[in-house]
Amino acid sequence: DAKALLESIARSFGYIYGREHNVRVNTISQSPTFTTAGSGVKGMDKLYDFANRMSPLGNASADECADYCIVMFSDLTRKVTMQNLFHDGGFSSVGMSLRAMATYEKGLDEYKDENGNIIYG
């Protein structure tokens, strides 16, 4: 998984560059966000809507993510390093809920092929 690799690299570089150059290295896991790159992903609008409804604070916008990144450059976070920081309105910590179950009950028929198998991607 590419994200796991990126997080591992950040931890390794965070240790090396932290010790040798006092540099902090972190990753940020953002809410689903509408971007040019993401516009070609099938079902992105539904993923965005699902995450927005499931997140206690809703999805974070691209501008809010930019603000969060700016905060990470401040001296107020000078001891934060080698971390994957979630900026997703709480979505990553939400388990199954009544709201999620109601969403799943609606079915995935539009994401199935002619044999009834779910199409991933």
Over which residues does each language-model region extend?
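Alpha-helical segment proximal to the catalytic Tyr-Lys
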Residues: 15-19, 78
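Glycine-rich nucleotide cofactor-binding loops and adjacent beta-alpha elements
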Residues: 20-34
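Residues immediately C-terminal
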Residues: 92
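A short, polar/charged loop-to-alpha-helix boundary motif
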Residues: 95-107
